[in-house]
């Protein structure tokens, strides 16, 4: 069970959570999140909670909605409403990628969190709800992040709605890259 690091703390469901910092799972009851499906949580490399989201609101480590942290365009009923990644080679910048529900009009978007803001509690910057897909490119509720073979950069991967098309974006130290399309998976 030992899992100290960015995935040490999980918040989900109805005010529920688990921490793995002690070596065994321990229930947490201090969260502010209430959601039926998708969530994302991120901690620092020492296992200290940074923030968590249901794809709509972002709570800081004190379980208070962070500055500019309301109004993300994910959907709490989306099976994967959000994922959080750390910007490669940055100690303080994180990206939240959100996914709308069932081919909804808000599609796949990203927002930037700067942990140096708001006294170290973090804030969403002006890069909030930036669209990755046009409304004509409806996405499913699926989104994931995969480490690049260079062991530094990442790929964000989504699947189009009712289609075999997968779309990928690279994330490297310069930010979020151009769209790449993979298709015909069968």
What are these regions (language model features)?
Residues 1-4, 33-48, 73-92, 133-153:
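Structural signature of eukaryotic scaffold interfaces centered on beta-propeller domains
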Residues 9-13, 43, 50-54, 91-101, ...:
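Hydrophobic core segments of beta-strands in well-ordered, beta-rich domains
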Residues 16-25, 58-62, 102-114, 162-170:
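Structural motif
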Residues 27-28, 49-82:
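Active-site-surrounding "flap" and adjacent substrate/cofactor-binding loops of secreted or lumenal enzymes
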